[in-house]
Regions:
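Active-site bordering "gate/hinge" segments
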Residues: 2-321, 328, 337-340, 419, ...
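Dual-mode signal for accessory low-complexity, basic/Gly-rich regions
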Residues: 296-486
Length: 486
């Protein structure tokens, strides 16, 4: 008889399909080597001097100039069933953008946040000319507050606090982990017309649970994210214990009937639908596609109870900011209001005021993207939205095809409802499918309680941050067993 085969964290998380596995592997020391920063930490004053000099030299050669610089540190602490770990890494970058007299924009990017590195990037754009334009930028803005420093021991203790919250752990939980992830970005934005600076400390706390339901792994999580101090907010005990209960939930065997149904989406699923829809259709980049432009020119009517905005000024929002990566001050943008599409997310390429030009890691290619999407709450408690149909829970991905508008939203489970109460039947791995505007157009209930969800993914190896605040939504759509990709 074969004995037990030891699994590494990488193999275990891979077998379970844990979505946050790469972050945990990195924090627990199982990932690849962390590249050391190419430059030491810099104080704000000397960085500003170098950047202003770069703007002055570029402004003497080009009609429009913008320089964006970032010094970013990521710290991740994790505790799992096998041990604990803390990982730290730092990334610097400077993006110099200029508009030529022909109207074409050019960029030069460097990872050297040093006087010599910035000067070399300027020469790559403007040559060796010593000419400098006169700048009237006035006094620099006040320094942003310095976040409290936490050593490895303190960070591990924060993770262990999350673990101690759970009074419902059992031997059926085959994997449990707690995570504290901090992205600290110090950002400067300077042009001939403005000088701005911000410190964005984005914090995520997460509890991850995994269990086997027959031969099928079930992975659940509780997560909270914000901008501010590590101890400003905590994961609620009830959220951590709910993640454990959901992982242990026994599913109803047998086939699931695919058909159109009334569904209630829990906040993570509602957030997933709104996030995927806004990024696929409600940006200036999407509107440049002819098929998207045609859909937006004559969209179907939407219910008056549904209002969606993107608001980076929301206090403590994980995806919030004071200015975007093109230097435009933060302001809310209404996307859905009064039963119609009311606006879109735009960057500099779209003309107008822009305001949502965002770069992955503050150094990647600029793109129009959401910051903190908010679905306005309704008047009724979420329990009042339940009637006949299904309660869909646990977001496991959403996709919207910009060309056709077709949306597919994956859910970890579907609870059958009769007379507003669960019947006890729970089906695993389903998905809601249909036209995005049809799914939004059939929203017939919006709950008053909202939940804010943080999103951190990567593009080209650089992080993208955003968040969505959403309540339960009741709508109607086609529900089927989830179709896994090969």
């Amino acid at each position: 008889m074969l004995g037990p085969v030891p699994l590494s964290r990488r193999e275990l998380l891979g077998a379970l399909g844990a979505a946050s596995g790469s972050t945990l592997l990195w924090a627990l020391g199982c990932g690849g080597p962390v590249r050391p920063p190419s430059t030491p930490a810099r104080v704000s004053g000397e960085v500003r001097t170098w950047l202003r000099d770069a703007v002055a030299r570029l402004a003497a050669a080009f009609p429009a100039v913008h320089v964006l610089a970032v010094s970013r540190q990521r710290t991740t602490a994790a505790v799992d069933v096998l041990g604990a770990g803390v990982a730290r890494a730092r990334r610097d970058g400077v993006v110099l953008a200029v508009r030529e007299r022909s109207g074409r924009w050019r960029e030069q990017v460097t990872s050297e946040l040093t006087q010599a590195g910035i000067a070399a990037a300027v020469r790559a754009l403007a040559g060796a000319s010593p000419r400098r334009a006169s700048l009237e930028l006035g006094e620099p803005p006040p320094l942003p507050p310095e976040p409290a420093a936490l050593d490895d021991r303190a960070l591990r203790e924060r993770c262990e606090q999350i673990t101690r919250l759970d009074g419902k752990l059992s031997s059926r939980i085959v994997y449990a982990a707690a995570l504290v992830d901090v992205d600290d970005a110090h950002v400067w934005s300077i042009s001939p017309a403005h000088d701005r600076e911000q410190r964005l400390v984005r914090v995520r706390k997460q509890a991850l649970r995994a269990a086997w339901n027959g031969t099928r792994p079930v992975v659940t999580e509780a997560e909270r994210g914000w901008t501010g101090g590590v101890d400003d907010l905590d994961l609620p005990r009830e959220a951590v214990e709910q993640a454990t209960e959901d992982a242990l939930l026994l599913m109803t065997p047998g086939a699931f009937e695919d058909k159109e149904r009334v569904v209630v989406l829990d906040p993570p699923l509602a957030a997933s639908l709104v996030d995927a829809g806004a990024r696929a259709l409600l940006t200036s980049a999407a509107a440049r596609r002819p098929e998207v432009r045609r859909r937006l020119e004559a969209p179907p009517p939407l219910p008056a109870i549904l209002a969606i905005a993107d608001d980076p000024t929301a206090p403590g929002a994980y995806g919030g900011f004071q200015f975007d990566d093109e230097g435009v001050p933060a302001a809310p943008i209404a996307l859905v209001e009064g039963g119609r599409i009311a606006g879109a997310l735009a960057d500099r390429a779209a003309g107008g005021s822009g305001g949502r030009g965002r770069r992955p890691g503050h150094v990647g290619a600029v793109e129009p993207a959401p910051s903190h999407l908010r679905v306005a709450p309704g008047a009724a408690p979420h329990a009042a939205l339940r009637d006949e149909g299904l309660l869909l829970e646990g977001a496991i991905g959403a996709a919207v095809d910009p060309g056709t508008g077709r949306a597919v939203i994956g859910a970890a489970r579907a609870r059958e409802l009769k007379g507003g109460e669960p019947t006890g039947r729970v089906y695993a791995d389903v998905e809601l499918a249909g036209d995005l505007f049809a799914l939004l157009g059939q929203v017939s209930g919006v709950a008053r309680e909202t939940v804010a969800l943080p999103y951190r993914d990567e593009a080209g190896g650089e992080p993208r941050w955003r968040s969505v605040e959403a309540p339960h939504l009741r709508t109607r759509g086609f529900v089927r067993a989830r179709r896994r990709r090969a």
